[in-house]
Design a protein with these regions (language model features):
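Ribokinase/PfkB-type carbohydrate-kinase core domain
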Residues: 1-49, 54-190
Length: 190
């Protein structure tokens, strides 16, 4: 912080933040529900080599492209989100300023559950609950149409790929031919 403070004053940082409020971006990608189950470990079970724990609490947060959209929105950036799944979920809700476009409302949102030992704040286990996104011929034209709209209006497009098969190889072939810069983040358990 001292280095930042010496190099940039408050007014400079404020000007940069005000510029962010003028931006409009399009985020396309995998939504994820990040669930944290907190427990207190008690030791090994007497009847089997199983870790015995007492449940304390469970918290769920938006992850994947949902988290990216929330962070960008918190900086004042206008966000157009293209993803899948239902907008409202009993576990999380997005900021209502984020324009949510679901191209498949029936596809379940992947969930990653992490079991955390509260005593040491250490991750004991991680479980993935997901189905790969079913590819069909209707999805690619929908994505192309939405991307072309944002390209025509000179808006930045960011692809957020967590490996749940949302983007087909045909989509990547298409996007690689786009003459504007497209930023991509990929991360996968598959």
């Amino acid at each position: 912080l001292n280095l930042i403070g010496r190099k940039f004053n408050f007014e400079h940082i404020e000007r940069l933040l005000l510029k962010l409020k003028k931006l409009e971006i399009c985020l396309i990608g995998d939504p994820i529900l990040d669930t944290y189950t907190f427990c207190q470990t008690e030791g090994i079970s007497s009847k089997s080599p199983t870790l015995a724990s007492i449940f304390k609490k469970k918290e769920t947060y938006p992850g994947g492209v949902l988290a990216v959209s929330e962070m960008a929105n918190a900086l004042g950036i206008k966000v157009n989100l293209i993803t899948y799944g239902k907008k409202l979920n009993s576990k999380i809700q997005l900021n209502n300023r984020i324009k949510f476009n679901s191209i498949n409302k029936f596809q379940p949102i992947p969930e990653i559950e992490r079991i955390i030992n509260m005593n040491r704040m250490e991750k004991l286990h991680q479980m993935y609950y997901f189905q790969n996104f079913p590819q069909n011929k209707k999805i690619l034209p929908i994505l192309k149409k939405k991307i072309n709209y944002f390209l025509k209006n000179k808006k930045s497009i960011y692809l957020i790929d967590f490996g749940f098969n949302f983007f087909s190889s045909d989509f990547f072939n298409y996007i690689s031919k786009v003459k504007y810069s497209v930023n991509t983040h990929t991360n996968s358990v598959n």
